[in-house]
Amino acid sequence: MPLKKTALLLATLAAVATTTTGCAINRATATVDPSVNLGSLKAMHVAKQPKDDNGIKVLIAEKLRSRGYSVTTGSEKPSALDAVVTYIDRWRWDITMYMLELTITIRDPGNDYPLASGKSYHTSLTRMSPSEMVDEVLNNIFKEAGK
């Protein structure tokens, strides 16, 4: 094979490899304080992030309700609570907007201590819908807790 054809073939292969592999990162973690029994929690309040325009608060509340928890989402948190749920959602643009990362933390309502926390991180090539990411984070938290 002449040198020009070999160089062209290698350049083409390099271009294809560079454009098709990308950074596909998929990471999901959860930690739960060993002294905490998440099964004993009954009433939770999901605190809205000030910049949440994507309805993540509602998704989290719906998923927790489907697990049997009593969940509120209003701006005022009720006085009788077992936990406050906070979250941080990070979004990126890649042709369309997608959620890059979601962190959900279940906190003690009295002192804000994190009882359990989970995180889901998916780059563009492994992106999930917001609902799927909420599911993934909560499933990992409750799996880690043994509930």
Predicted features, each with a name:
Residues 96-122:
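Amphipathic beta-strand/beta-sheet edge segments enriched in Tyr/Trp
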Residues 35, 39-87:
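N-terminal segment of the mature soluble domain
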Residues 24-38, 60-65, 70-71, 121-147:
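C-terminal/domain-edge helix-coil "capping" segments
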